[in-house]
C-alpha cells in the first residue's frame, strides 16, 4: 500500500452572491448612514454626506464588509486610471504632432492639444515647430512612447482602445468581487499568499515582461531611430518578435538563441544587456540597454523574493514568525503583536504603504533629472521641471496621508489592553522625550538656517560683501555632499566591469552631454548657497515631522485631554467648560502638517528650478562654451532672502506677468485666478464660525421677509469643515500659482 501525505485542503475563500445589485440605493443619498439617509434638515447635511460617503468604518464595524468595500473601490480606482491613460494615448493619436516630433525631437516641441477657435482662444496654439500649432505639453509621454518603441499614431490608437477595454474590465471586476464573488476576511489576511502574488507576479513577472518588451521591441526600434531611419521604414514590433534574423542583424548574439543562457555563457548577451552608466550622447537619456538589463535584474530579485514565504506548501518564512523574532536588547517585546495590527487595521497597513510610497515618489523626482530615463527627456526643460515638481508634491501629500491614517489607526483600531512593552507601546511611553527633542531640533534648525540668511541680508544691506557667507567671502562648503559626489565620480571601473561612466553625470568627472546644442546634463557644483538652502530643507522637513508625529503619538490621549480617544479622530474642542482645548484633534495635526508640507516642498522646487536654470540648463556653442539660462547667478544671489525675492520670484515671474496677448496667456490667467483661490482660503482660515452664523441669520431674515426662505435651514460650516475648505483652497491656489509661474517661465526661456 502507498502512504501519501494528506493533500492540503483548498479552502473556499469567497462568498457567492452576498449582496444583491440594486440601483435603488443610488437614488437614496446617504443610504449608508441612518442619520444622513433621513435627508437634509440643515445645509450641514451635504457636508456630512461628503465626509462620510467613503468612510467605510462609519458604515459598519464588520471588518470583512469594510475589506470588501475597499477591495471593490480599488478596482474602481484602477478603472479610472485606465480611462485616464486611454485618454492620454488617444490625445497622442488624434490631436498630437507625435510623428513629427519623432522625426526631429530637438527642434519640435511636443503638443497633444489644439484649442478650438472660440472667442479667440486659438491664440493659445503656439508654434511648437515643424509647422504645428498647439499647446506644448510637459507630461513626458512623447519621450516615454519613443522609449517603448511606438512609431506611429495608429499604435497609439490601438493602445488607447486596449486601455479602454481594461478600464471596462476593472469596472466589471469591482462589481463582481463585491456582488457576485466577495472574498472572505481570511483571504484579505493571508499575507504570505499576497506577498507571493505581489512580489513574484506584479513586480517580478511585470518587470520581466517589460524587460522582454525592451529587448525585443524597444531596443531595435530605438537603434533605428537613433541612426536617423524614417519611422515609417522601421519594421513593426511584431516583425522583430517573430523574425529573429531581424534582431540578429542589429545584435549578432541573437542568432545563437537561448543557448548562451543555458550554457551559462551569459556574456554573449552583453550587446543588449549592458552596464555602461552615464547617458547616451545621441538622446541624452540613459542607455536603453542599461535599462533593459536593470529590469531583468529586478525581475530575478522579485521572482526570488516572491518564493520566500510559506503558502500552501509548508516551506518558507512566516511573516508572523519573522516579526515576533525581531527583538533587540533595548526593545522589549519587539514587534510582537504587529502582525495582528497589520492584518486587522487597514489604516495601519495604509499608513506604512503611504509613508514608503511617498518617500519612493520623492526618490523618483530626484532620479528623473539626475538619471533621465527616456530619450530627449533631459533637453525638454519644461517637462523636466514639471516631472520634478509633480513627483515632489505627490510625495509630500502621500507622506501627510501616512500620518493621517496612522492617527486614525491610533484612534479607531489601537487596542491598548493587549499591547504591552512592544515597540509601539515603548514609543508611546516615551513620546514626551521624542517630541520635546524634535521640538528642540526644529528651534535650532529654524534659528540657525534662517539666521545665516538674515546675516547675509544685513551685511549686503550695509555694503559689506566681504563679511557675508558666500563662495567668495566666508565659505560654508557642503563638504560631506562634495565628498559623496567625488566618491561616485571616481567609482566607474572600480564598481562594475565594463562600466564606463558613473551612475549620474551630476556627480562630477567633468563630462557634459549636450543634444542639439542644448545641455542635457553636466556635473552639478555644490557650494555655500546650496549649504544654506539645504538647512532650510532640514528645518521645514523636521517641523512637518514634528507636527505630524505629535498628532499620531498624542492621538489617543494627552495631559490636556486624557480621554482624547473617546472624542474621535476629528473634533473641534473638548466640549463646553474646557477652554483652551480647541484644535487638538488628530485631524487638526494633519491640517497643520499640510501647511508645513506645502512650505517644505515649495522651497525644494524653488531650489531645483533656480539651480538647474543657473548651473545646468542652457545652450552650448560650437566652441563648447556653455551659456546657462540665468548665467550661473544662483551661487551669489540665493544667499540672501532679498536675492530669492528679487532674482528668483520677481525676475522669473516676468514671463507669466507679461504673457497676455501671447500663446502663454492662459498661464497668466491661471496665475491670477490661482492667487484669488489662495486668497479666498484666508477667509475660511482667519474667521470664526460665529461670525458666519450671525451673517447667515440676517440673510435668512431677508429671505423670510421676501417669503423665499428655503425648507433646508442654512448653517455656517462647522469649525472642522471651515478649516478643511480653507486648507484645500490654500493648497490648490498655491500649487496652481506655482504651476503657472514655472511653466510660463520655462516654456518661454527653455
Swiss-Prot record:
Cofactor binding: number and manner: P700 is a chlorophyll a/chlorophyll a' dimer, A0 is one or more chlorophyll a, A1 is one or both phylloquinones and FX is a shared 4Fe-4S iron-sulfur center.
GO cellular component labels: chloroplast thylakoid membrane; photosystem I
Binding site for [4Fe-4S] cluster: 573, 582
Locations listed in the record: Plastid, Chloroplast thylakoid membrane
Residues where chlorophyll a binds: 683, 691
EC number(s) given by UniProt: 1.97.1.12
Record-listed phylloquinone binding positions: 692
Enzyme type, top EC level: oxidoreductase
Pfam family, one: PsaA_PsaB
Disulfide bonds, paired cysteine numbers: none
Family: Belongs to the PsaA/PsaB family.
Function: PsaA and PsaB bind P700, the primary electron donor of photosystem I (PSI), as well as the electron acceptors A0, A1 and FX. PSI is a plastocyanin-ferredoxin oxidoreductase, converting photonic excitation into a charge separation, which transfers an electron from the donor P700 chlorophyll pair to the spectroscopically characterized acceptors A0, A1, FX, FA and FB in turn. Oxidized P700 is reduced on the lumenal side of the thylakoid membrane by plastocyanin.
Listed name of the protein: Photosystem I P700 chlorophyll a apoprotein A1
Organism: Lepidium virginicum (Virginia pepperweed)
Amino acid at each position: 500500500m502507498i502512504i501519501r501525505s494528506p493533500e492540503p485542503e483548498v479552502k473556499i475563500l469567497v462568498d457567492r452572491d452576498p449582496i444583491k445589485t440594486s440601483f435603488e440605493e443610488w437614488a437614496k443619498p446617504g443610504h449608508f448612514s441612518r442619520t444622513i439617509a433621513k435627508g437634509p434638515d440643515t445645509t450641514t447635511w451635504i457636508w456630512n454626506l461628503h465626509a462620510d460617503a467613503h468612510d467605510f468604518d462609519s458604515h459598519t464595524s464588520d471588518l470583512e464588509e469594510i475589506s470588501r468595500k475597499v477591495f471593490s473601490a480599488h478596482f474602481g480606482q484602477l478603472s479610472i486610471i485606465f480611462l485616464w491613460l486611454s485618454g492620454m494615448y488617444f490625445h497622442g493619436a488624434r490631436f498630437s504632432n507625435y510623428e513629427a516630433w519623432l522625426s526631429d525631437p530637438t527642434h519640435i516641441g511636443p503638443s497633444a492639444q489644439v484649442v478650438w477657435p472660440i472667442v479667440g482662444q486659438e491664440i493659445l496654439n503656439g508654434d511648437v515647430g515643424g509647422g504645428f500649432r498647439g499647446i506644448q505639453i510637459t507630461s513626458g509621454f512623447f519621450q516615454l512612447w519613443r522609449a517603448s518603441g511606438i512609431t506611429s499614431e495608429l499604435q497609439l490608437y490601438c493602445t488607447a482602445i486596449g486601455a479602454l477595454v481594461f478600464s471596462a474590465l476593472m469596472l466589471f471586476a469591482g462589481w463582481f468581487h463585491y456582488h457576485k464573488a466577495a472574498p472572505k476576511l481570511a483571504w484579505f489576511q493571508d499575507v504570505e499568499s499576497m506577498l507571493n502574488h505581489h512580489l513574484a507576479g506584479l513586480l517580478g513577472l511585470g518587470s520581466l515582461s517589460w524587460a522582454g518588451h525592451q529587448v525585443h521591441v524597444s531596443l531595435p526600434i530605438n537603434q533605428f531611430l537613433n541612426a536617423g531611419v524614417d519611422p515609417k521604414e522601421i519594421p513593426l514590433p511584431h516583425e522583430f518578435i517573430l523574425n529573429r534574423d531581424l534582431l540578429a542583424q542589429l545584435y549578432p548574439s541573437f542568432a545563437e538563441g537561448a543557448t548562451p543562457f543555458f550554457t551559462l555563457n551569459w556574456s554573449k548577451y552583453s550587446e543588449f544587456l549592458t552596464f555602461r552608466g552615464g547617458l547616451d550622447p545621441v538622446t541624452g537619456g540613459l542607455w536603453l540597454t542599461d535599462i533593459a538589463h536593470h529590469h531583468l535584474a529586478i525581475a530575478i530579485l522579485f521572482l526570488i523574493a516572491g518564493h520566500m514565504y510559506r503558502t500552501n506548501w509548508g516551506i518558507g518564512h512566516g511573516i508572523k514568525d519573522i516579526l515576533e523574532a525581531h527583538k533587540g536588547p533595548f526593545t522589549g517585546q519587539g514587534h510582537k503583536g504587529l502582525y495582528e495590527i497589520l492584518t486587522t487595521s487597514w489604516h495601519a497597513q495604509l499608513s506604512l504603504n503611504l509613508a514608503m510610497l511617498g518617500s519612493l515618489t520623492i526618490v523618483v523626482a530626484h532620479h528623473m533629472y539626475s538619471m533621465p530615463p527616456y530619450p530627449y527627456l533631459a533637453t525638454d526643460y519644461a517637462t523636466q521641471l514639471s516631472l520634478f515638481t509633480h513627483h515632489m508634491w505627490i510625495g509630500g501629500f502621500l507622506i501627510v496621508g501616512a500620518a493621517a491614517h496612522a492617527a486614525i489607526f491610533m484612534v479607531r483600531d489601537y487596542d491598548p489592553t493587549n499591547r504591552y512593552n512592544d515597540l509601539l507601546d515603548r514609543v508611546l511611553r516615551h513620546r514626551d522625550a521624542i517630541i520635546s527633542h524634535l521640538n528642540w531640533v526644529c528651534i535650532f534648525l529654524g534659528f540657525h538656517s534662517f539666521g545665516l540668511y538674515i546675516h547675509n541680508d544685513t551685511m549686503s544691506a550695509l555694503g559689506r560683501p566681504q563679511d557675508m557667507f558666500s563662495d567668495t567671502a566666508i565659505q560654508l562648503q557642503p563638504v560631506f555632499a562634495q565628498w559623496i559626489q567625488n566618491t561616485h565620480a571616481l567609482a566607474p571601473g572600480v564598481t562594475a566591469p565594463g562600466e564606463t561612466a558613473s551612475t549620474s553625470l551630476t556627480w562630477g568627472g567633468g563630462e557634459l552631454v549636450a543634444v542639439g546644442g542644448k545641455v542635457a546634463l553636466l556635473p552639478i557644483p555644490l557650494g555655500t548657497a546650496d549649504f544654506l538652502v539645504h538647512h532650510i530643507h532640514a528645518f521645514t522637513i523636521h517641523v512637518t515631522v514634528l507636527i505630524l508625529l505629535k498628532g499620531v503619538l498624542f492621538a489617543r490621549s494627552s495631559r490636556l485631554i486624557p480621554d482624547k480617544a473617546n472624542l474621535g479622530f476629528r473634533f473641534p474642542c473638548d466640549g463646553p467648560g474646557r477652554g483652551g482645548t480647541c484644535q487638538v484633534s488628530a485631524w487638526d495635526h494633519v491640517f497643520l502638517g499640510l501647511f508645513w508640507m506645502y512650505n517644505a516642498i515649495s522651497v525644494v522646487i524653488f531650489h531645483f528650478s533656480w539651480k538647474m536654470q543657473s548651473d545646468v540648463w542652457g545652450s552650448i556653442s560650437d566652441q563648447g562654451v556653455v551659456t546657462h539660462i540665468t548665467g550661473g547667478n544662483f551661487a551669489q544671489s540665493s544667499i540672501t532672502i532679498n536675492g530669492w525675492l528679487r532674482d528668483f520670484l520677481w525676475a522669473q515671474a516676468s514671463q507669466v506677468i507679461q504673457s497676455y496677448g501671447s500663446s502663454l496667456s492662459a498661464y497668466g490667467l491661471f496665475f491670477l485666478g490661482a492667487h484669488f483661490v489662495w486668497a479666498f482660503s484666508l477667509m475660511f482660515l482667519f474667521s470664526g464660525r460665529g461670525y458666519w452664523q450671525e451673517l447667515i441669520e440676517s440673510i435668512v431674515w431677508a429671505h423670510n421677509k421676501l417669503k423665499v426662505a428655503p425648507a433646508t435651514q442654512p448653517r455656517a460650516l462647522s469649525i472642522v469643515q471651515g478649516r478643511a475648505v480653507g486648507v484645500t483652497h490654500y493648497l490648490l491656489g498655491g500649487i496652481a500659482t506655482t504651476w503657472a509661474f514655472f511653466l510660463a517661465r520655462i516654456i518661454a526661456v527653455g
